[in-house]
Amino acid sequence: MFESISGILTLHERERLCVEVHGIEWEIAVSAYSSAAFGEVGSHVKVFTWLYHREDALRLFGFSNVQERTLFLSLTKVEGIGPKQALKVLSSISSQALCAALDTGDLCALQRIPGIGKKTAQRMLLALKGTLALTDAASCAQSQTDDRAAHPSNLGCAPHAREIEDLVTALVQMGYDRKMAAEVIAQESAALCSVGRSLYEEEATVLKRAILALSIAHPHAVAPAAE
């Protein structure tokens, strides 16, 4: 019903935004990761949205990009995960780390998400493993295009500090040591640069290669999940 809302940001909290559009203020529930992507109060923002409605309530959920919304909707299809729980998941783990955990069948990484027990993690893998790769690539395309248009100097082999930090953070959230993760990501990024390929286009591949490299070189690097 609502694809997105564009307007002036009037409230900016960790998991809640208010956006004014032509004199009407919309309250939007967001993940902590999406919230961090928006600017200061008074700035113009575009929020991708999904409307949750039932007999006694209407609620808008918002996302900084289409990728996160796609993940959110996929999570709500898992038995036992409703919209509120799906948003909590996305506040606890980055989209990159979640996609990687689902794609590689990393049950331990999923169990480290607050509120996700072993049975729910197993249901997530059963429902979503192997289903997000193409969706992830397609939904990332628009946000990557927009980012390249806004920052044309970041093309080619220019430094990708934000993308590198996102990848390192994703690995840390999966239980890997930050220093080891940073070293592997730096190596993979340099390898891409040496053949003239862009990290913008290869982020998901780099994350998978880093997980494989860390698993081989440091098989005990991931801390076991709490019982």
UniProtKB/Swiss-Prot annotation:
Q: Name one GO molecular function term.
A: four-way junction DNA binding
Q: Which InterPro entries match?
A: DNA_helicase_Holl-junc_RuvA_I (IPR013849), Hlx-hairpin-Hlx_DNA-bd_motif (IPR003583), NA-bd_OB-fold (IPR012340), RuvA (IPR000085), RuvA_2-like (IPR010994)
- Offer a single GO CC term for the protein: Holliday junction resolvase complex
| Chief location of this protein within or outside the cell | cytoplasm
SUPFAM superfamilies per record: Nucleic acid-binding proteins (SSF50249), RuvA domain 2-like (SSF47781)
Q: Where does the record place the region Domain II?
A: 65-143
* Entries under Gene3D superfamilies matching the protein: 5' to 3' exonuclease, C-terminal subdomain, Nucleic acid-binding proteins
Where are the annotated segments for Flexible linker? 144-158
Region annotation (Domain I) ranges: 1-64
Where does it reside? Cytoplasm
Q: Which residue ranges does the record annotate as region Domain III? A: 159-227
- Please provide the Gene Ontology terms (biological process) for this protein: DNA recombination; DNA repair
Keywords from the named record: Cytoplasm, DNA damage, DNA recombination, DNA repair, DNA-binding
Q: Which NCBIfam families match?
A: ruvA
Indicate the quaternary assembly: Homotetramer. Forms an RuvA(8)-RuvB(12)-Holliday junction (HJ) complex. HJ DNA is sandwiched between 2 RuvA tetramers; dsDNA enters through RuvA and exits via RuvB. An RuvB hexamer assembles on each DNA strand where it exits the tetramer. Each RuvB hexamer is contacted by two RuvA subunits (via domain III) on 2 adjacent RuvB subunits; this complex drives branch migration. In the full resolvosome a probable DNA-RuvA(4)-RuvB(12)-RuvC(2) complex forms which resolves the HJ.
Question: What is stated about domains?
Answer: Has three domains with a flexible linker between the domains II and III and assumes an 'L' shape. Domain III is highly mobile and contacts RuvB.
Output the HAMAP family linked to this UniProt entry: DNA_HJ_migration_RuvA
**Its job:** The RuvA-RuvB-RuvC complex processes Holliday junction (HJ) DNA during genetic recombination and DNA repair, while the RuvA-RuvB complex plays an important role in the rescue of blocked DNA replication forks via replication fork reversal (RFR). RuvA specifically binds to HJ cruciform DNA, conferring on it an open structure. The RuvB hexamer acts as an ATP-dependent pump, pulling dsDNA into and through the RuvAB complex. HJ branch migration allows RuvC to scan DNA until it finds its consensus sequence, where it cleaves and resolves the cruciform DNA.
Q: What is this protein called?
A: Holliday junction branch migration complex subunit RuvA
